[in-house]
UniProtKB/Swiss-Prot annotation:
GO cellular component, one term: COPII-coated ER to Golgi transport vesicle
Compartment(s) of residence: Endoplasmic reticulum membrane; Golgi apparatus membrane; Endoplasmic reticulum-Golgi intermediate compartment membrane
Cytoplasmic side: 1-142, 200-205, 249-278
Task performed by this protein: Involved in the anterograde traffic pathway from the endoplasmic reticulum to the plasma membrane and the organization of the Golgi architecture.
Family listed: Belongs to the YIF1 family.
Record keyword Transmembrane present: yes
Protein name as catalogued: Protein YIF1B-A
Topological category with respect to the lipid bilayer: Multi-pass membrane protein
Native source organism of the sequence: Xenopus laevis (African clawed frog)
């Protein structure tokens, strides 16, 4: 037997750690610190945008939520401050009360303005020291009818001027401006008179605008009657409306201007009470003057 062929080379020993995938018997855990090497010898790029998106989203969502919450709080504070400042100048919450009407109230109120002679109860109803809304009390003042009547008066005036070939935007604008100016002058004169007479009343400026604006209902009726039946119809209807508004104003304002005496349940006599009565009658008597002054030139 050949000596060279019978000689076997000793087996080659593999160096420790040459194969990272095979663990030694005494090693409890695999050593993965090196990590598998990707094919092609390329290593992962840690600056890849795909790995940064979750972190950016995690950081950006709290910031965006905080910004939205901060912005909404600023908006709510600004709205609250603006509402307070507006309410100081114009009592919006109180003005809403004067527009709380419905169709039934409007119909009954116009009927009361045209035919107030059969009405008995003129007291304004209260609920917990607060007057009820106009739609629940026909005696409560409102702004819906005066505003709509003023606008309708301007439209009817334009129609009357058009039938007489005198219509122009300038003339209609002057008509609206003069009517509004006279209304403001009337309200200011009443406020000054109440101040000079030192009347302790619950009448507000908005109440005076409402009561003095009711005369436009009669003015509209007079002008329409003049367009349909001529001057005769105009004078008859306007005279009826003037008497009705005088009666309505006396019965309504008497309770407002004499509210101090009515609250005490006694009839106050003397010079002060006479001034109050004269003031009530003067406010009522001036209504027909304005009704005629603002409508006579519209009927020919």
């Amino acid at each position: 037997m050949n000596q060279e062929s019978s000689f076997r080379a000793p087996p080659k020993r593999r160096a420790r750690g040459s194969n990272p995938n095979v663990s030694t018997p005494h090693q409890l855990f695999d050593d993965t610190s090196g990590g598998p090497v990707p094919h092609g010898g390329e290593y992962p790029n840690h600056s890849s945008p795909a790995l940064g998106i979750p972190a950016q989203a995690f950081l950006s969502e709290p910031m965006s939520n905080f910004a939205m919450a901060y912005g909404s709080s600023l908006a709510s504070q600004g709205k609250e401050m603006m509402d307070k400042n507006i309410d100081r100048i114009i009592p919006v919450s109180k003005i809403k009360y004067y527009f709380a009407v419905d169709t039934v109230y409007v119909g009954k109120k116009i009927g009361l303005l045209m035919f107030p002679y059969m009405h008995q109860d003129w007291e304004v109803r209260y609920q917990q020291d607060t007057p009820v809304a106009p739609r629940f009390d026909i005696n409560a003042p409102d702004l819906y009818i005066p505003v709509m009547a003023f606008v309708t008066y301007i439209l009817v005036a334009g129609l009357a001027l058009g039938t007489q070939s005198r219509f122009s935007p300038e003339i209609l604008g002057m008509q609206a401006s003069s009517a509004l100016a006279w209304l403001i002058v009337e309200v200011l004169a009443i406020l000054l008179s109440l101040y000079l007479v030192t009347v302790n009343t619950d009448l507000t400026t908005v109440d005076l605008v409402a009561f003095t604006g009711y005369k436009y209902v009669g003015m509209i009726s007079g002008v329409i009657s003049g367009l349909l039946f001529g001057k005769t119809g105009y004078y008859i209807v306007l005279a009826w409306c003037c008497i009705s508004i005088v009666f309505f104003m006396i019965r309504t304002l008497r309770l407002k201007i004499l509210s101090e005496a009515a609250a005490e349940g006694v009839l106050v006599r003397g010079a002060r009470n006479q001034l109050r009565m004269y003031l009530t009658m003067a406010i009522a008597a001036v209504q027909p003057i304005f009704m005629y002054w603002l409508t006579y030139h519209l009927v020919r």
